Amino acid sequence: MNKKTLLVIFIVTLLIADEVNSFKFGGFLKKMWKSKLAKKLRAKGKQMLKEYANKVLSPEEEAPAAVPAGAPERRRR
């Protein structure tokens, strides 16, 4: 879209938002914060943060490297 079209859409959106007096942004944010999806995302974020903190604060000892397998024994005929 060109700039004029975007400007018209922006102005119309502002006019509509100005006319809707019952819409309160704070109430909208509150509803979003209490939604089930937001709760799931916050829980997942907390879990990931805890896992990261545990990994950073107490790094696990590196497991000893596996002993490389030698060349397989050849069968005698």
From Swiss-Prot:
Q: Which residues form the signal peptide?
A: 1-22
Q: Does the keyword Secreted apply?
A: yes
| Expression sites by tissue | Expressed by the venom gland.
Can you give the propeptide residue ranges? 74-77
GO terms in the biological process aspect are: regulation of blood pressure
* Primary location group: secreted
Keyword Transport among record annotations: no
Q: Where is this chain's protein located in or outside the cell?
A: Secreted
State the GO CC annotations: extracellular region
Keywords tagged on the record: Antimicrobial, Cleavage on pair of basic residues, Hypotensive agent, Secreted, Signal
Disulfide bonds, paired cysteine numbers: none
* Function of the molecule: Antimicrobial peptide. May also inhibit angiotensin-converting enzyme (ACE) and potentiate bradykinin (BK).
Belongs to which family?
Belongs to the non-disulfide-bridged peptide (NDBP) superfamily. Long chain multifunctional peptide (group 2) family.
The name of this protein is Bradykinin-potentiating peptide
